[in-house]
Amino acid sequence: MSQTVTIQEPRPNDQRIPYQCREVRRAKGGFANRTYDYLYDPLFIVSSERDHAQANIQATLIRSRLKKVPNFRSMFSNLFHHPRYSMYWSKTDPVPLHVTREWRGQEAKHKEVLRLQAAMDTSFQMPKEKDEDPDVSGKNRYKFFDRPFLPFLQQMPLNVVLSPVKTQPLLLTPESSKYAIIPTKSTVATQTDYRDADVQTDPYSPEYVVCQDTIPELLTLANLTWGRGLPAGQAEVEIIERAREKRAWEATLPPLNDSVQAEKRRKMMNAMERKEWAFREGEIEKLQELRLEVLKQLLKRREEDQNELNMRHLNDQWYKLQEAKEAKVAQIRHKHVSDIRKLMGKGKNIEGKLQRRDIISDYSNFASQVYGPLSRLGRFPDNNSEDFVVRNHYLNTYEGLVELESSLPDFVTQPRIKPPKPQIITTKAGFLKRTARMDYELAEVHKALVDKKNKGLEGTKSLRFLQKNPISQARLPTPSLEMTSYEEGEIEMAVIYLQKLLRGRVVQNMMFEGKEKRLELILELRTSHALQEDDKLVKKAEKQVTLALQRQRNLHEDKLSVIENHLGDLEGRVLADMFDFLSKELVRLQEERRIHAFAMLAERQRRMREAEESGRRQVEQKRLQQEDMIFKEVIKVHQSTVTSYLEDIILNTEERTAEEQARKEIEKIAEEINNIAYEMENRRTYLQSEEIVAELVYSFLIPEVQKDFVKEKVRNAQRKHILAAHEIIHSNTETMLEEQVYKELQSEDFELEEEAESLDSEVPTVSVSKTSTIKPTQDEGEG
């Protein structure tokens, strides 16, 4: 028997643990292994540099530096040429640069070589090892503590199991429960390896003494035990009554030694046996009826369970279809809202002009996306906001707020504002103070220094935007006029006049060519614009006619549009009614097909159940027939057993009686023969003894010796013939064996040649060596 003690310890203060860490513990059941233990942990050991590289690869795969950056324009796109996100390689390395990524086994090998060299060379001095962090209060603080092992300090059984601590949500403890409460009670439970049913004993039975030649009726009920017949019921009472009747009937039977009433005894026993068998058959029928009722109940229960399971499957399928339908409707509605929003966005900017972002207006408008970004663009400002929720008694309850307000001083709720005193920079006489003047001069000097510094920086500052570098142009030369004679002036004036004529002619030619080229355009303008009054009147009349025709056309188009609208309305109504009728017909056909399918399934299930029921009925009938046959065979075996038992008893009795009589007769005859032999021995003479000896020698000894001599002579005569026959037989068998071995070797060589040819045909470069056949000679076989 083992005992298990459960000790419930007080729950430790869980407020010091961060909320996020507790959530991780609850979710994962413990902290996961660190990714870069092979670099930081000094206890992390790998066998070789290859394993170190493998650990580095695993850490790189686990801590992938590839990040997905969403594209706000196509965040919800499923198209291949408009991806939702792009991959970005993060430049931030999680491992600092001062941490080496090399295998630490090289340092260990170096230290091992130094140690071996120091062991071999006594003059070699080992370099002193310096601890990387010898500070006691640092990360190595745990190395300076040791807990002694006192095995007998506290007697605690090895199978003590501490009950797990149930985590509770973070609540602010009141002032009265700041310290851990010492429990006044501890629950200690014990558990055994045995059940109550295993240790339950029968009721107490006192000792008893049975008188001689008496059989108490109570002892005949020894087979009834507690739970198996006790406490007694109607069936047990009937069994007891039948046992009493049988004992009374046995008392009325004639005795066995009465040969006169043997036939009567046999008839009474046969009648009782038939009665018992009839009673037994009735019990078997009742038992079978009871089993049949139980089987019917089980079948009914199984059918109910199957129907319930089918209904559950149908309900689950219906719920799944409803959820899929709701999800599809929600998706359609979401897409509808998105499309409407896109259309409204396109309607605001019909021309499709690109507008530059106005940062000032965005930050001045508190309803812009700067202060409230849209979640559909991938910005979730309230993400993980539940981690920063402060659950405080003073903030979440009205009583806490009242208590907090009462505990605050007056200057918090009623602020006291003191106006600042003006700084006096003048004296009573109205002059500026020396300190104020010095401050003013220092401010001027500081401003001059800052301006000078900024000017120097502006000279060396690189230009952000391209600026035009003005290039100084040389000054044009001043025109000068030289005085000429009158004749030269006349000639120059004539030349200038000739040039004017030429230029005018050229311009005239150009105008003519342009008029010829644009003649069609000029004619087109003349059709709509007139310069003369008559032409203007004609054009005005044509314009009025055209406007009248346009008005008539517009009226005709309006009538046609009204007619088309009415026709479209009628067509829409007709189509709506038709589609409604078709959809209802489709639903009706689907329901009809579904009902037909259910009916077919029900019919199929009914047929399968009928087949199973008929099969079970046949199996039951076959089992009943087998039980009847078994019962008949058992009766036959019982009868044959009784018959064989009686036959064996009679035969053994006859054999024993005959053997006793034969033994008595043999003893009597042997006694008579012994008497005769003793009498003859007493009356025999010496000559009669010699005659008896001679008769024994001549009748038994000499014939036996002669018979052995004849047998040996015949054996010697047949020996040479047997040897010759052996030689002939063995020579023939050896030749036959040699021929058989030779044939087998030839068949093996033929098979090897065929395999070699097949291999040569498949792979020409492979050569197969043939085994040489050896034909054994007759001499070798004989040897």
From Swiss-Prot:
Tissue localization of expression: Expressed in the testis, in cells involved in spermatogenesis.
Major site of localization recorded for this protein: cytoplasm
Comp. bias intervals (Polar residues): 764-776
Residue ranges of coiled coil: none
InterPro entries cross-referenced by the UniProt entry: CFAP91, CFAP91_dom
Region (Disordered): 748-783
Location(s), subcellular: Cytoplasm; Mitochondrion; Cytoplasm, Cytoskeleton, Cilium axoneme
Keyword annotations of the record: Cell projection, Cytoplasm, Cytoskeleton, Differentiation, Mitochondrion, Spermatogenesis
PTM summary: Phosphorylated by PKA.
A Pfam entry, by short name: CFAP91
Biological processes annotated in GO: axonemal central apparatus assembly; cell differentiation; cilium movement; spermatogenesis
Family: Belongs to the CFAP91 family.
Subunit structure: Part of a complex containing MYCBP, AKAP1 and PRKAR2B. Interacts with MYCBP and AKAP1. Interacts with CFAP61.
Full protein name: Cilia- and flagella-associated protein 91
The organism of origin for this protein: Mus musculus
Highest classification ranks of the organism: Eukaryota, Metazoa, Chordata, Craniata, Vertebrata
Gene name of the encoded protein: Cfap91
